[in-house]
Amino acid sequence: MASQTTLLLPLLRRELVPICLRSWATDVLKTSACAYSHHPTTLVGSSLRRIVHQRPFSAQTIYLNQKRDFSSTLQRRFASDSDSFDPSRIERESDSVDVCIVGGGPAGLAAAIRLKKIANEAGNEDFRVILLEKAGEIGDHIVSGNVLEPSAMNELFPDWLSEDNPSRFEHATPAKSDRMRFLTKKHAIPIPCPPQMNNHGNYIISLSQLCKWLGERAEEVGVELYPGFAASEVLYEADGSVKGVATNDLGIGRDGKPKDSFERGMEFHARATLLAEGCHGSLTKQVIRKFDLRRDSQPQTYGLGLKEVWEIQPEKFRKGEILHTMGYPLPKDAYGGSFLYHFGDNMVSLGLVVGLDYPNPWLSPYGEFQKLKHHPLIKSVLEGGKCISYGARALIEGGFQSIPKCAFPGGALIGDSAGFMNVPKVKGTHTAMRSGMLAAEAAYSALANTDSGSVFLYDYEDGLRNSTIWKELKEVRNMRPSFSTPLGIYGGIVYSGIEAYIFRGKMPWTLKHHSTDPDSTKAASECEKIEYPKPDGVISFDILTSVSLTGTNHEEDQPVHLQVKDWDKHAEECYPKYQGVENRFCPAGVYEYVEDPSKKLGVRFQINAQNCIHCKTCDIKVPTQDINWQTPQGGEGPKYYLT
């Protein structure tokens, strides 16, 4: 979707803003519900700084005298307009910090907060921790179920829910009941809830809201938050260790040439870099390849989670009720299930998770989600209500046997970048936060004992293996892969029940993930074609209507961030065999094949990058593995609400 033209308030990078003024500006900006624009630069003094927040409210400009010295403070250099434009010839500004964290989800924020707390308690208040987040605001790109197991939160903030805490988190709904159902097309059959899914003592939340709250707490302890900064490149020392990251260049047109607004990205040099990008992060992929971190682990497998938030009729609301289902609408050869959580005031979170190792290229996770809502059990709750939010995100399902090496020279993987999702438990936030806290402790210890240079976080790897993360993931390691064995879905249910109730992970074997998700995809000619019913516009919706609820926004005149080297070659290799699988696995209508008589196949492959909601499914599932998801301009993408 094209960016909207607005009147801008230039605000500088947060580290340059006095705290009193930052607080005032933030309060003013939060009152605006308008979509923000994405002009990339603002000029202060003699240096060009990237805008972090840009929201309309008045025609005034704030002038600030405070600024930090950078290792390179450059005058504006206009890029050459020649065909041979090479941005790497233009020097980037850089800033040196102690720890750089990429990603403002629960893992990254927990790591940042824990680091600064440790440093502050040690009297080392000059210890710099920065966190880069590609979304325009913390929480904007976060989507999750979410029933929170509060163990890590209780440790990080013991009073996070206390009535005596004026800054307490106010949006947690205590879980009251658990139900599990196996769905047929018309019926819902009660089945036992596995012990891992017992939610007594847990809380139904919006993870997006929780991350916003954690962001505020992070600033209070001195973390430097940079939302709107999209890290796009890993930087290396001469010895090959990671020395930080760089943000992407701005002001490059779709044709690859610089515009008048061109600005080079910025480098952040750090002695330790923690990657907290979530599932299948673009920098995480680079680091895993560079250091061969998967050499001793099995292939990762993924799922796609789709979620809507509905406001329902008060008489149908059951605060704290939790429902999970298996079976319909998914076919027998597709792993997955749905959830329905009653939270807040007359709100429900409804979602479907589909394992991306499904074989049938005719299957559409979005289409299956819309079918789910017409099941009598679900429809009876939604009728008379209103869908107010939609989102989708890939998630890790590989479990214990797919965890890579998590430490590398100069940094570590934390949260879903490493893959700590507990699939049978349907939870990953507590493990993500726990991993971030463990990495923070290891990083501070390593840096405190080394005067210079990058570090290796040996203590982090050891800490993981001695943590509750390792214990609980090892216990359930055989459940998810059991559904991909000759046992099938019903055999997988029985086997998982035996593991859950009797063996509890003590079996001497570990089941394997035998292939990757793209390799699991069969040719369209080998599979039954699936026709999806037309949405009614009341309970079910067409995909563009749903995308409009995400608030996603990308400037059109920029290079496509969904990188396909040769679009025609991709179509020739993919379309005849898979018949447009990209259009069906994408939950945002980004990919399509358009009739075009001038093309050899009679169709043209098209990428509608403006629709992208940053779910990463294309990078994971495409059988030809030639779609490379990269970060667009900072601040772009979805602006999720209550997800």
Language-model features: where?
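N-terminal mitochondrial targeting presequence
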Residues: 1-87
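A short, basic/flexible loop-to-alpha-helix module at the beginning of a structural domain
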Residues: 80-96, 121, 256-265
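N-terminal Rossmann-like FAD-binding beta1-loop-alpha1 element of flavoenzymes
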Residues: 98-130
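N-terminal FAD cofactor-binding segment of flavoenzymes
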Residues: 126, 134-185
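Predominantly flavin-linked oxidoreductase catalytic cores and closely associated redox partners
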Residues: 217-380, 438
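FAD-binding beta-loop-beta segment adjacent to the flavin cofactor pocket
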Residues: 393-423, 546-557, 571-585
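Active-site-proximal substrate-binding core of FAD-dependent oxidoreductases
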Residues: 419, 423-425, 441-488, 601, ...
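Iron-sulfur cluster-binding cysteine motifs and their immediate structural context
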Residues: 576-639
